[in-house]
Amino acid sequence: MTDLAGGALEARIEYAARRKKEMNCCQAVLVAFADKLGKSEDELLRLGSGFGSGMGTMEGTCGALVGAIMVSSLLSPDGEARNNSRAIMSRFKELCGGATICRDLKGIGTGKVLCSCEDCVRNAVLAAGEAL
């Protein structure tokens, strides 16, 4: 568990950004909400392990965004997960230059980085926190 029980959103954002240095983007977002999810860090690390680097290929959805939607799905009241997912996706796109695919965010093919991994993690935690 994290030491963020009852912590402010800004503390979660900074915690996730620090933890990103040790794990993939999805995992960093998940562990920032471990206290709210009631899951151990080990469980969340395993859950998020396959979602780094755009699901392993940089071709898929950003792992940080996937992690934020996982958090929302687990914490949203019945019937609200879909709306919260839309809100998270919309806010993430707004904060990350309109992209949600890892390779686009990283500027693969264009040479223009829209959002660093650390900023994707920060933005995903922010979007999830705002939606919830």
Give the role of each language-model region.
Residues 1-20:
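Polybasic, low-complexity association/targeting segments
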Residues 2-5, 30-49, 95-102:
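Acidic-glycine-rich active-site phosphate/pyrophosphate-binding loop
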Residues 3-5, 86-132:
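C-terminal binding/interaction regions
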Residues 16, 29, 33, 47-52, ...:
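Short alpha-helical scaffolding segments that buttress acidic/His motifs in well-ordered protein cores
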Residues 29-33, 65-75, 124-128:
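Buried hydrophobic packing segments
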Residues 37-47, 73-87:
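Phosphate-handling active-site elements
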Residues 51-71:
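Glycine/serine-rich anion-binding loops at beta->alpha junctions
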Residues 63-64, 68, 76, 80, ...:
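Catalytic phosphate/nucleotide-handling subdomain of diverse soluble enzymes
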